[in-house]
Amino acid sequence: ANEWSQNANMSVRWWNQRIADYGGGFIFLLYLADHLGGGPAVRQLVQSTAQGAAAIENVARSPVGASPGVIGTDFRDIYANFTIAATLDSDQGIYGLSNLYMTPACGSSDFCRIQPAATNSDWTTPYSSTGNSVEGWGVRVFKFTPGSASSAPLTMRFTGDVPGMDGVIMSRAISDGTYTRS
């Protein structure tokens, strides 16, 4: 699983027999089981006549042991919520996994969260990160902290090389630690 957590730019949907493919698939199925009703939800997924994203969407819309749509109703939202959970492993509902403890840093014997491609806390000059390739349905995580800079609005721009690339921004409230997705 850590091979994918350290290389989450690799797709969860494309299967190329890489160790990371097994790790990403394992964590994704644990996430679906955790939030959609456990073993019965996985059974529902495996028995579905639909394939790929459509099968996952069907289970999410009519789960055996959870509220419909709890993690989203289309694959884009389901995948975004999964990658947030695999990055944060928060105890804030869908942004974590209760059936797997994930450590912030990768070690030899622990499962780890998605590792950031880059971090930044120096805002004395503009920050830029280039050359971050991502396979379809892969993810790149960047961690930004305020550092010693005074509070100011943060402007972000994402430029993808391919149409249809999407991004999600998660922010954490200083007052209570609650995460917000935008």
Regions found by a protein language model. Name each.
Residues 51-182:
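Beta/coil-rich, acidic/histidine-enriched accessory regions frequently appended to metallopeptidases
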Residues 1-35, 46-86:
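Acidic/His/Gly-enriched intrinsically disordered linker/tail segments
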Residues 36-41:
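Loop/turn elements at helix/coil->beta-strand transitions in domains of secreted/extracellular proteins
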